[in-house]
Amino acid sequence: MADHIDVPTALGDNAARQLANATKTVPQLSTISPRWLVHLLQWLPVEAGIYRLNKVKNPRDVRVACSQRDESELPQTFVDYDEAPREYFLNAVTTILDVHTRVSDLYSSPHDQIKEQLRLTVETIKERQESELINNPDYGLLANVSDEQRISTLTGAPTPDDLDDLITKVWKEPGFFLAHPLAIAAFGRECTRRGVPPPTVSLFGSQFLTWRGIPLIPSDKVPVEDGKTKILLLRTGEKRQGVVGLFQPGLAGEQSPGLSVRFMGINRNAIASYLISLYCSLAVLTEDALAVLDDVEIGKYHDYPDTYK
């Protein structure tokens, strides 16, 4: 008996797709994060890439008196300044982006190849910027915590008592905690263990855990080594004498504060080059604007008895 052969009676899917237009997304970059630290800092423009931080010398030597309704002699005083204040110099996060003109000429529909290459490169530069704000050995947050503002955990895992102790170090208008997401999860477990689940607050359209009304801001740029990390507490703003970000205004090819994109030309291989630079730094105006909780263990879990039998 002859094999039965199916004869199509209508146009098939595979053939029909040849006439259809697929909706194409722009390239998705998994390393992009919200970069909350950059959003929460106050950014100050600097002149010539230099920020000089003047401080009062021996502030407790300034003498004042409360009048006792008599003719006693009033104190004489003056406020002295440091003669060698620290100067912060802007740091550059930079790269050169190369795009072949053939690629940008032929394959820029529906998405502009140059625009997408620039967007993805700028996002990567901004991620590096946040990492430098935390980890840079010169101006980063972790490198600028004074010894008096460092404490260690009581038992290893971050407990409510640890964060309370941290608040005592930055008690004047604390802004937010900054921690790795794993550290925030570890703190949440310790709160659950004690029956005090932390409340949440909505910022920038996202939900954040809080402690004593202070939000815990996550950043994957806070280092984790050997199962341990750190939790920082910041006060921000120039008027509060807190932590501030620094940038250079008025750059050639400025795209956003401190970010410059400049066309460098086309070489003999028909490759167009773009110089992308982001100039930034960070300053801690007073020592009590920043504190850190060291030796935070992130791998501690708890077993709970089954009470639902």
Where are these regions (language model features)?
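N-terminal "assembly arms/tails" that initiate or stabilize quaternary assembly
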Residues: 2-84, 286-288
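Alpha-helical scaffold segments that mediate packing/assembly in large oligomeric complexes
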Residues: 94, 98-173
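Intrinsically disordered, low-complexity linker/loop segments enriched in Gly/Pro
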Residues: 75-81, 86-101
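Short charge-dense sequence patches
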Residues: 63-79, 111-118, 140, 194, ...
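Extended, solvent-exposed, turn-rich assembly/linker loops in the middle of proteins
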Residues: 145-208
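Helix N-cap / beta->alpha transition motif
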Residues: 102, 178-183, 235, 286
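Structural beta-strand/beta-sheet cores of well-ordered domains, especially the beta-sheet scaffolds
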Residues: 95, 173-175, 212, 272
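Sequence/fold signature of self-assembling virion shell proteins
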Residues: 199-309
